[in-house]
Amino acid sequence: MTSCVNKSEDSLSLWSEFVNNKQRTIHKWKHYFPAYEAHFSRFVNRPMVFLEIGCGRGGSAQMWKRYLGPHAMIVGIDVKPECKTFEEDQIKIRIGSQSDTSFLEDVIAEFGTPDIVLDDGSHRMSDVVETFRFLYPRTSPNGVYLVEDLHTAYWDEFGGGLKREGTFIEVCKGLIDELNAEWTRDALPATEFTHSTLSMHFYDSMAVFERGRRLPHSDVRISGRAAILKGLTR
């Protein structure tokens, strides 16, 4: 994964899809593309559900369709009724608010468990946090949850601010502790987040969560040709 993040944008197939776009308008920050490629490439040409919160001008859904291949279902949600016109083969749009959990439940019931969730919606901290709380446990056990444009976590008009309680950045700081709860000597109980999350990744204005069941902790000691594996005592 690290090697892909370090590649130049020009070497990435998703970047090629973006710069050669001749369909609807796509608006993205250039530095997002290596992270997209690193976390999404394993889903290419596989049956999967991609849930995009915030449809923009419709071009990003088309880009994900081209990149992920013919077996992907791209589901976009937005509050703007005109986004419904973005529908085409493999792309479905549902109109509703990301803060409406009943609406989100209906979307999942219709299209199935999302393998990737990309939150590019309102960027308001209350929406980002509540959407994550609801959708993350409902994302595929081996899926990816990505929140972008997190610079808004530092902007007052989006409910943000440096070290302001309740922003998604501050929530993530607590989730780092949850990820490592089993090492806190019972100071912090392990949660479902602890057990269902393999890793958390932070980039400029972006947070990515890789889901998956973790293997039992094992300590590996190597001396010459001998390797000893033993379970760690927590």
Predicted feature residues:
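A short alpha-helical cap/connector motif
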Residues: 1-118, 122-147, 151-234
